Amino acid sequence: MMLIKKIEELKNSEIKDIIDKRIQEFKSFKNKSNEEWFKELCFCILTANFTAEGGIRIQKEIGDGFLTLPREELEEKLKNLGHRFYRKRAEYIVLARRFKNIKDIVESFENEKVAREFLVRNIKGIGYKEASHFLRNVGYDDVAIIDRHILRELYENNYIDEIPKTLSRRKYLEIENILRDIGEEVNLKLSELDLYIWYLRTGKVLK
């Protein structure tokens, strides 16, 4: 398979060091506070139907404001920083504040897949992709972030027959299992595989 070959080539290049470093940054969240985890959750809420770069920029600008700013002020900041859906995202972030102890909550579950179900059910603005993104970014390995880049790569390499317009829970888990199989073939965890495929599609290693 062409995708396997491309990933193996990247694993033997300097990109591997960049990806390994990024994974270590994610793992360092195990030693961070509830507040830092909450800010990362807000980043993942922001990136839905937006860009990762835009989310990173806004996260840096707002910082602790995710925890403290009144909704109207947060809305205004998101608008000025160029977020397309500033009203909705401000609403979701303010509603999510009842889970400010998000690290404690997530770590109370037996594994990341159980934690993901909780996040999807309880936090407005968080679907399977966003929940997986958050969990990967705070150091968990066994969840896949299935976005358009990943879907296109799978489609172009004949792992899926079509690019679904929407992803039901069943479809999400089905595609996640395909990615898990690919990961096993190239000896990568889902958290790592995502960064390799993202690099293949975009030439970037983000978060």
UniProtKB/Swiss-Prot annotation:
It comes from the Archaea. Changing residue 129 to S: Loss of activity. InterPro entries: DNA_glyclase/AP_lyase_Ogg, DNA_glycosylase, HhH-GPD_domain, HhH_base_excis_C. GO terms for molecular function: class I DNA-(apurinic or apyrimidinic site) endonuclease activity; hydrolase activity, hydrolyzing N-glycosyl compounds. SMART domains: ENDO3c (SM00478). The active site is at 129, 147. The record marks 207 as: Important for guanine/8-oxoguanine distinction. It catalyses: 2'-deoxyribonucleotide-(2'-deoxyribose 5'-phosphate)-2'-deoxyribonucleotide-DNA = a 3'-end 2'-deoxyribonucleotide-(2,3-dehydro-2,3-deoxyribose 5'-phosphate)-DNA + a 5'-end 5'-phospho-2'-deoxyribonucleoside-DNA + H(+). Optimum pH is 8.5. Its EC number is 3.2.2.-, 4.2.99.18. It holds the Pfam family Ogg-HhH. One of its GO terms (biological process) is base-excision repair. Contains two domains separated by the central HhH motif. The C-terminal domain undergoes a conformational change upon DNA binding. Belongs to the type-2 OGG1 family. This is 8-oxoguanine DNA glycosylase/AP lyase. The lineage of its organism: Archaea, Methanobacteriati, Methanobacteriota, Methanomada group, Methanococci. The gene is ogg.
